[in-house]
């Protein structure tokens, strides 16, 4: 499920601190 995948990305992002999600062009620090 795409929603679960996005949640996984967010969890990884929270740990790594910085990430870029091309599909939405989202930059989160």
Swiss-Prot record:
UniProt-annotated binding residues for Ca(2+): 27, 29
Tissue specificity field: Expressed by the venom gland.
Metal-binding listed as a keyword: yes
UniProt record, GO biological process: arachidonate secretion; lipid catabolic process; phospholipid metabolic process
EC number: 3.1.1.4
Reported cofactor(s): Ca(2+)
Segments passing through the bilayer: none
Top class in the EC scheme: hydrolase
Cofactor note: Binds 1 Ca(2+) ion.
GO CC field: extracellular region; host extracellular space
Reactions that this protein is recorded to catalyse: a 1,2-diacyl-sn-glycero-3-phosphocholine + H2O = a 1-acyl-sn-glycero-3-phosphocholine + a fatty acid + H(+)
UniProt KW keywords: Calcium, Disulfide bond, Hemostasis impairing toxin, Hydrolase, Lipid degradation, Lipid metabolism, Metal-binding, Platelet aggregation inhibiting toxin, Secreted, Toxin
GO molecular function, one term: toxin activity
Coiled-coil intervals: none
Main localization (coarse): secreted
InterPro entries for this protein: PLipase_A2, PLipase_A2_dom_sf
Subcellular location: Secreted
Top-level taxon of the source organism: Eukaryota
Job of this protein: Snake venom phospholipase A2 (PLA2) that inhibits the ADP- and collagen-induced human platelet aggregation. Exhibits strong hydrolytic activities and prefers the anionic micelles (dPPC with deoxycholate) to the zwitterionic micelles (dPPC with Triton X-100). PLA2 catalyzes the calcium-dependent hydrolysis of the 2-acyl groups in 3-sn-phosphoglycerides.
Family (UniProt): Belongs to the phospholipase A2 family. Group II subfamily.
Protein name, UniProt field: Acidic phospholipase A2 Omo-E6
Protein species of origin: Ovophis monticola
């Amino acid at each position: 499920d795409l929603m679960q995948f996005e949640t996984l990305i967010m969890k990884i992002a929270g740990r790594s601190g910085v990430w870029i999600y091309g599909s939405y062009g989202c930059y989160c620090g």
